């Protein structure tokens, strides 16, 4: 990224990389590795700076630029788009944390990347000056590419009972990456397990997930509700893969194309409305949050169905490795919690008839 780069110039630079990314997709699938040189090229293009805070070299971009770039990367190679999208959104998640940890991470290395898992499979115990952390987290996308880890853990009291749901930041030297990822698809995302054993975590690196409220002085991008971009990070790759499959299809598949286009329109509308809320110093209400989550999960489902329609019509033949790979990738991506259609629509339905709902799905 050059001085004076804009978010639109970043999108243009990412598009320039797409032929190279697409040409490498079969090799990524075969070896299970996205070349680190591609990550460097995405850094150079400014992709990972899109969601970084301005005080640390970020661009404070319109989130639609990030969503579009991630979708187009995924159209070229879904493993690359999924990996890059999650590494980038973790930059955004970090941006609302204590400024001391931002300085610790990006002050030392402006290109530092984080992997994450927010399944609360860790245990935090209070000690002087902070906590002791132990745990194991499965399927942390990008673990081999990251120099920091962001994970969820339950803070427990002296009696062992859970007291809080915390997010914790851990440097690379304090955790172990166990190479376990061997998915049916998305083979290049490096979603390995990470292990932390009785590691000290300073107070400023641990945050209450339930009580976290972004500073009103932060840019609007950083004040978007946390679930919004995190769930979309799991959906843009599916939409990108669907676009590629439809483009490769010999038939028109008009309905499937319309469904994918509709999904992008709904996503853009919802994110724009959330931005309007935070710019007006209002938190998006339950109606908007649930509609955003509904449309996001339906977009994931429509993308999956679009790929299945193409594959069902064409069949998966030995001379169609592209469709075969895309099919495996989307079947793997659908397993992510962000794409749990039944859970989300059940909650939306309960809310629509006046039943109280658990807002953690937001």
What are these regions (language model features)?
Residues 17, 235, 242-245, 249, ...:
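Amphipathic alpha-helices that form helix-helix packing interfaces
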Residues 2-4, 17-25:
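Generic N-terminal amphipathic, Lys/Arg-enriched alpha-helix
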Residues 7-11, 32-36, 228-239, 253-264, ...:
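Amphipathic, non-membrane alpha-helical segments in soluble helical-bundle scaffolds
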Residues 34-44, 48-146, 163:
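Glycine-rich flavin
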Residues 139-177:
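A short core secondary-structure module
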Residues 314-362:
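Glycine-rich phosphate/cofactor-binding loops in nucleotide/flavin-utilizing enzymes
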Residues 183-265:
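Glycine-rich beta->alpha junctions and the first turn(s) of the following alpha-helix
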Residues 22, 26-30, 262-301, 308-318:
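C-terminal helix-coil-helix/basic helical segment that borders enzyme active sites and/or dimer interfaces
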């Amino acid at each position: 990224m050059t001085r004076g780069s804009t978010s639109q110039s970043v999108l243009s630079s990412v598009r320039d990389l797409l032929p190279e990314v697409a040409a490498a997709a079969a090799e990524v699938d075969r070896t299970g590795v996205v070349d680190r040189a591609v990550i460097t090229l995405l850094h150079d293009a400014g992709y990972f700076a899109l969601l970084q805070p301005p005080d640390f070299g970020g661009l404070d971009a319109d989130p639609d630029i990030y969503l579009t770039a991630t979708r187009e990367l995924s159209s070229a190679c879904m493993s690359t788009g999924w990996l890059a999208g999650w590494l980038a959104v973790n930059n955004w998640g970090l941006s609302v944390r204590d400024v001391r940890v931002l300085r610790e991470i990006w002050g030392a290395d402006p290109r530092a990347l984080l992997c994450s898992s927010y399944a609360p499979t860790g245990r935090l115990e209070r000690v002087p000056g902070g906590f002791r952390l132990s745990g194991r987290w499965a399927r942390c996308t990008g673990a081999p590419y990251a120099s920091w880890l962001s994970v969820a853990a339950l803070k427990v009291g002296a009696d062992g009972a859970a007291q809080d749901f915390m997010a914790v930041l851990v440097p690379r030297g304090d955790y172990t990456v166990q190479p376990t990822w061997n998915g049916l698809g998305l083979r290049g995302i490096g979603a390995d397990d990470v292990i932390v054993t009785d590691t000290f975590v300073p107070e400023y690196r641990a945050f209450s997930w339930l009580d976290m409220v972004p500073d009103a002085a932060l840019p609007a991008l950083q004040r978007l509700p946390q679930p919004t971009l995190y769930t979309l990070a799991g959906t843009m790759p599916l939409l990108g893969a669907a676009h590629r499959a439809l483009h490769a299809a010999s038939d028109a598949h008009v309905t499937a194309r319309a469904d994918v286009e509709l999904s992008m329109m709904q996503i853009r509308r919802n994110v724009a409305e959330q931005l309007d809320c935070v710019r007006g110093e209002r938190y998006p209400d339950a109606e908007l949050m649930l509609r955003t989550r509904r449309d996001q999960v339906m977009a994931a489902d429509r993308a999956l169905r679009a790929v299945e329609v193409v594959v069902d019509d064409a069949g998966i033949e030995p001379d169609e490795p592209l469709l075969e790979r895309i099919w495996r990738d989307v079947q793997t991506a659908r397993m992510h919690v962000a794409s749990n259609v039944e859970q989300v629509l059940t909650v939306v339905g309960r809310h629509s008839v006046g039943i109280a709902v658990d807002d953690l799905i937001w």
